[in-house]
Regions:
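Extended non-catalytic accessory segments flanking core domains
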Residues: 1-276
Length: 276
């Protein structure tokens, strides 16, 4: 599989590897990842690739843990190599290979976001990885809609909050922030799903910025202009640590203090009866 990184595209190739993650389910990614067993893997290069099988395809076969042989066209989609246009069912060679591909330890920060470094995300693209560090939820803006969390080494600060705009220090911190974070996704392709972390998610049990995650693992991929880890069904879920960002208790009201209240009418829409 590693040879595909330099192979001519729009050509047909036959590959053999172990299925590490299968996203052929409703609102999934219509395909799966296949990776070379650890004993045959090459160093400092990706040993995995995504196999795209659209919902309209009649091709079937293979499940997580199977070593398979398949033949497809090599192409690039959203800056990620993939095999598509499979014409035959997937052939299973060995159905007991799940333990032959172990997650690779992936630590932040990256040395680079391009392929010029042995510790760049491109080096691990499509592979099964684990994040051994305790990472902080630095952004949850897209969590409710897309199931995305930005994880980082500690809290990240906007560079111009600390340094003058366009200063060398601000530019250096901006670059450091980019190398020190990664998106942890939910493995689905549709919007507005029920958030899956923490367990029993609710208004009283939500996931806030400043919380931490331990032992996250999944497939490292590039999607929607960002490096992210997609969870794998059946593998361990990350541990959510909430005690690191405690909320202040309610302050007792002082009768001598004045409280100021306001009401935002910017989005106070009351139908077709005019405004207000």
């Amino acid at each position: 599989i590693a040879d595909l990184s330099t192979a001519a595209q729009n050509q047909t190739y036959t590959v053999r590897g172990v299925i590490t993650a299968d996203y052929r389910y409703a609102n999934g990614f219509s395909g799966f990842y296949v990776q070379t067993p650890d004993t045959k893997a090459r160093a400092n290069i990706s040993n995995a690739i995504f196999v795209y099988i659209p919902n309209s395809s009649a091709v079937k076969g293979g499940q997580v843990g199977d070593e398979v042989i398949l033949r497809g066209r090599l192409t690039t989609y959203q800056n990620q190599l993939q095999l598509d246009q499979l014409q035959q069912d997937i052939q299973t060679c060995n159905s007991n290979m799940a333990n032959q591909v172990q997650p690779i330890s992936l630590e932040l920060p990256f040395a680079s976001l391009t392929g010029g470094s042995t510790h760049s995300p491109q080096r691990y693209q499509g592979m099964l990885v684990k994040l051994p560090q305790t990472l902080t939820v630095s952004e949850n803006y897209n969590y409710g809609r897309y199931g995305e969390l930005s994880l980082s080494l500690g809290r990240l600060y906007i560079p111009t909050n600390l340094y003058p705009a366009l200063s060398p220090e601000a530019k250096a911190l901006a670059q450091k922030n980019l190398l020190s974070k990664i998106i942890f996704d939910d493995g689905y392709n549709n919007q507005n799903r029920t958030p899956w972390l923490p367990t029993n998610f609710s208004a009283a049990n939500t996931l806030r910025s400043g919380y931490q995650l331990k032992n996250a693992e999944g497939i490292l991929e590039y999607r929607f202009n960002g490096w992210r880890v997609q969870p794998v069904l059946g593998r361990n879920q990350p541990e959510v640590i909430t005690q690191t960002n405690p909320r202040q208790s309610v302050i007792t009201k002082n009768a001598n203090h004045i409280r100021v209240a306001s009401f935002n009418v910017l989005n106070y829409d009351n139908g077709a009866t005019g405004f207000p």
